[in-house]
């Protein structure tokens, strides 16, 4: 790899100038890709931190919800709880869009709240327990966080893929493309110097022959 050169390059001055320009662009591209890689990694870990916090919050809310639901079942009876559950009007609405993180398009999912109060859920006060209201509220809030988690985890997957792709491009430039360009530049410079020496030697021979004839 250390001495590998680009294929199909002729040792001419034009090729040398083109390769020097290409080397500058490759080095600049390498620097920009490293910056992108580092920014993506930083963003990746910042978002990753949010995942654990959201998961912990969901677990707490679900624990409260199931505890309150159990209390409601004891207070109201299983059948009454089931009737109340069946009367609830489902109305989860999602707004899905996207945003760009360092050129990576990631999802943005917004949920419009299912229910904001007891009355909007569809079951009445009569024959229901306050524990059921608390359980419903905690379940609804858990759903919102679970939707957010879906957005976050999808974003993490997409960023991880882009980080790996960017790393491969950085490594290719750093360990393959740029070294080959530099090796080819060195080869052409050396070959041009040899050609100049050969040309100079030939000119000396020609001059000597002319001088001898005179």
From Swiss-Prot:
One of its GO terms (cellular component) is plasma membrane. It is a peripheral membrane protein. InterPro entries: V_ATPase_D (IPR002699). GO terms for biological process: proton motive force-driven plasma membrane ATP synthesis. Its main location: membrane. Signal peptide: none annotated. It comes from the Archaea. One of its GO terms (molecular function) is proton-transporting ATPase activity, rotational mechanism. Keywords: ATP synthesis, Cell membrane, Hydrogen ion transport, Ion transport, Membrane, Transport. It is found in: Cell membrane. Gene3D superfamilies: 1.10.287.3240. Belongs to the V-ATPase D subunit family. PANTHER family: V-TYPE ATP SYNTHASE SUBUNIT D (PTHR11671). Component of the A-type ATP synthase that produces ATP from ADP in the presence of a proton gradient across the membrane. Has multiple subunits with at least A(3), B(3), C, D, E, F, H, I and proteolipid K(x). HAMAP family: ATP_synth_D_arch. This is A-type ATP synthase subunit D. It comes from Methanosphaera stadtmanae (strain ATCC 43021 / DSM 3091 / JCM 11832 / MCB-3). The gene is atpD.
């Amino acid at each position: 790899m250390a001495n590998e050169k680009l294929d199909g390059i002729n040792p001419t001055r034009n090729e040398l100038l083109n390769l020097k320009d290409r080397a500058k662009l490759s080095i600049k591209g390498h620097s920009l890709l490293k910056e992108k890689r580092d920014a993506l990694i930083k963003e990746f870990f910042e978002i990753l931190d949010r995942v654990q916090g959201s998961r912990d919050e969901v677990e707490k809310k679900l624990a409260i919800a199931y505890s309150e639901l159990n209390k409601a079942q004891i207070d109201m009876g299983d059948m009454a709880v089931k009737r109340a559950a069946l009367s609830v009007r489902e109305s989860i609405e999602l707004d899905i869009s996207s945003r760009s993180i360092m050129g990576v398009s990631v999802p943005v999912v917004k949920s419009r709240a299912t229910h904001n109060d007891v009355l909007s859920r569809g079951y009445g006060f009569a024959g229901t327990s306050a524990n059921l209201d608390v359980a419903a509220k905690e379940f609804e809030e858990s759903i919102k966080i679970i939707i957010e988690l879906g957005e976050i985890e999808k974003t993490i997957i997409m960023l991880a893929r882009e980080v790996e792709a960017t790393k491969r491009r950085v490594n290719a430039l750093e360990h393959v493309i740029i070294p080959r360009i530099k090796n080819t530049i060195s080869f052409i410079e050396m070959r041009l110097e040899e050609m100049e020496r050969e040309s100079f030697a030939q000119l000396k021979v020609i001059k000597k022959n002319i001088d001898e004839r005179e």
